[in-house]
Amino acid sequence: MVKLIPRISSRRNGRIRLRKNKHKIPQGVIHIQASLQNTIVTVTDVRGRVVSWASAGSAGFKGTTRRTPFAAQTAATNAIHTAINQGMREADVLIKGPGLGRDAALRAIRRSGIRLELILDVTPMPHNGCRPPKKRRV
């Protein structure tokens, strides 16, 4: 069955825009990827579809300031704000990476008012897999 989307047109420019209903998302998953240079926070619904995302670079931090905990906190606040506006109340948190911003981003999420069900560290650790690259000589 085809779902009809109401059309909005303006007589001045003749363009037709489509209006989609915003979905309410009560539960979600917050992914924090904290690399050594940047922190990326992605908010998804339970099925894995992206609701919002933010990074320290997209929050306006450039260069070496992107790796700071304050930049990670700002990125987490920006990503969570959109999710809260769409009705998110509960979330699981998956943290990946060795970066400086992992704790600061988690603190910002805790202060946002979203109830956290689960906090997991999903940093990939090799069980003696591939040989690492040679040591850097400066």
From Swiss-Prot:
Q: Which keywords does this chain's UniProt record carry?
A: Plastid, Ribonucleoprotein, Ribosomal protein, RNA-binding, rRNA-binding
Q: Where in the cell is it found?
A: Plastid
Q: Which GO terms describe its cellular component?
A: plastid; ribonucleoprotein complex; ribosome
Listed under GO biological process in this entry are: translation
Name the source's superkingdom: Eukaryota
Q: Pfam families given for it?
A: Ribosomal_S11
What would be an example GO MF term here? structural constituent of ribosome
User: What HAMAP family does this protein's entry cite?
Assistant: Ribosomal_uS11
Q: How does it assemble?
A: Part of the 30S ribosomal subunit.
Give the protein family.
Belongs to the universal ribosomal protein uS11 family.
Which protein are we looking at?
Small ribosomal subunit protein uS11c
Which species? Cuscuta obtusiflora
